[in-house]
Amino acid sequence: MQISAQFDSGNINVIEADTPENIILEINQDNQSDFFQWFHFKLNNNVRTEHIMTIRNAGKSAFVDGWENYQALASYDREHWFRVPTEFDGENLTITFTPDHDSVYFAYFTPYSYERHQDLLHQAQLDIDCQLQVLGQSIDGRDISVLKVGEEGENKKVIWLTARQHPGETMAEWFMEGFIDRLLDEDDGVARALLNKAVFYLVPNMNPDGSVRGNLRTNAAGANLNREWATPSMEKSPEVYLVRNKMLETGVDMFLDIHGDEALPYNFVAGCEGIPSYDERHQALEESFKDILLAITPEFQDEYGYDKDEAGQANLTLGATWVGEQFKCLSYTIEMPFKDNDLLPDHSVGWSDNRSSLFGRDVLTAIYHIVDELR
């Protein structure tokens, strides 16, 4: 029996693994940070033997509420992931599983590899409407890439989407994959109509270093990128610095920042009600977008979410609030669950890579219905 995490986005520390019924593990902290919650490891096992794996530091993780009613994910082939029995006692997260094959992977959520990220970018650039632009490099020397889809034009809107500021929120890049696939589908009428009205700038992975390192929330310098937007720097947060500069160059008429939430088992949005310039026009745009999304898909709801900011009290270090204030535009954080959508549960897979991708496709429809209202 062996346990390994020496691969892209791997994260686990083996404390004890002498017998299948008493495997003791710990999640490693993000580098230069106290955050931890993402895990991803491989178990070479005793087939048809019950394995009991206890992550003993789960109770000290970044979001302890994220373990309540949570079920870990497993896969034999790294393509098809399914939920497995998992319990949390306030301190320990215990995964109990009897494998049918010699090797099995476990993860906090379905991983989105750096290799797949490269495939997404380079397959997209083959489309005549798409350009792959490299804005610069991360601290570890990885490209900060943006896909430009469509062309600027008179009265055309500029729409930005970013994902994986927090690298452990892999559902965000699955969302982007679905969004991009649909936007580039020449047979899709919604996509074609949108590209007549808007140009898109899409960043599928804002934090490639943290993704490869197996971090939950930080980049290679230990920075939480979604707290860097007010004063980014090339030394600490080049990812935000480069993307923000590009936004200042292009302008922004709409921005969606795609995330995952550890605790809440729902899809929801967080808006800009606390920014200094928030007004009736901005509020009307936000309400319109939510109403459209509610009409499009039962995967979205607006009853559960974050507490709204008081007037003038928004944290402008966040991407969505900084963009909303800087460009006076519709700017939302979209959150998806690590657990399941409790309003439409799937006990086999929970919220999943495929459901994230389909939700991304649905959001394209919502943008189509609101694009004419943006300015």
Where do the PLM segments sit?
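Extracellular structured ligand-interaction cores
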Residues: 38, 103, 222, 329-331
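Short, loop-centered acidic/histidine patches that primarily coordinate divalent metals
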Residues: 56-58, 335-339
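A short, polar/proline- and glycine-enriched secondary-structure boundary/capping micro-motif
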Residues: 62-69, 116-119, 156
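Short helix/loop capping segments that flank catalytic or ligand/cofactor-binding pockets
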Residues: 63-64, 107, 114-117, 169-171, ...
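Extended acidic/polar, glycine-enriched regions
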Residues: 87-138
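Active-site/substrate-binding loop(s) of hydrolase catalytic cores
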Residues: 131-149, 154-316, 320-324, 331-335, ...
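His/Asp/Glu-rich mid-to-C-terminal helical/loop segments that flank catalytic regions of hydrolases
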Residues: 343-375
